[in-house]
Amino acid sequence: MSRWGAPPLLRNNKRGKKMRKLLFGTVMMALAPFCSQAALAQSDVTLKIITPAVTANAGIRDLAMGFEKEMGIKVQIVTLNMAKMVDELKSGTPPADIVFLPYALMDTAQTEKNVANGSRINIGRVRIGLAVHKGDPTPDISTVDKLAAVLKAADSVMYSNPASGSMEARIIDGMLNAHPEFAGVKRKISMNGEGGQAVARGEGQMALQLICEIVNHPDQLTSVGPVPDSLGAYIDSAAAVTSRSAHPKEAAQFLKYATQPGTYSLWLGKGLERMK
């Protein structure tokens, strides 16, 4: 379960852009004591992180910048389609040092000993939400019936292409197929990027999208909020040091840095609810 449940920040995005800037500044100040003992000289180590978009868009980039600045250790972030993550973990060159994966894939990675024993950290949950054009009304989607009414009233509801291997797209497609309340929704698959990006380009009225991929377009999109919990439309993610890491000590340092209490507000501001 989430630390906070459905966070108010994600339900009301009117002040989202300013709030995210404030949160980032606050988090960087909070992290300063963590790094007070760190050598600021540049290290010759470069950590390679492999991650799907769900966690790449939910705070990793900001944390990597802070880690590089404070610890002097470079971080390379490689964002991959979910379908390519496991192959890259097992045989990518150079080998990854840190991997972010949904729970089920991380469970398998542990069983197959592709991650270091005891290094797994459960990161958090990113929910599917509804995106509308910035400035458009934000409807009530707090129940399945209300969400269905909003979606059916739209000229088009965009989402990513399930055939691309996107876990997010499969979750959305499965949600719409599994519930009769959504019969009649005018679905439109984005053939060029995310559904939210398509809405931002003017190709549709609204989009179902991971919230972390809505709030990163503050000038074009507004996050109406997450879909109801009963729909099970979310991705829970974990991180671990890989068993092939050339820099396991530094990789463990990054995970400790990225998951200390002072980072909670940054993750939340990017659409990820930290887990207990």
List the model feature ranges, each with a label:
Residues 3-18:
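Short, Lys/Arg-enriched N-terminal segments with co-localized hydrophobic residues
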Residues 9-10, 22, 40:
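Leucine-biased recognition of intrinsically disordered, low-complexity hydrophobic segments
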Residues 17-26:
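Bacterial N-terminal signal peptides that target proteins for export
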Residues 25-34:
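Bacterial N-terminal signal peptides
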Residues 35-41:
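Sec/Tat signal peptide C-region and signal peptidase I cleavage site
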Residues 42-95, 103-112, 121-126, 132-276:
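Exported/periplasmic ABC-transporter solute-binding proteins
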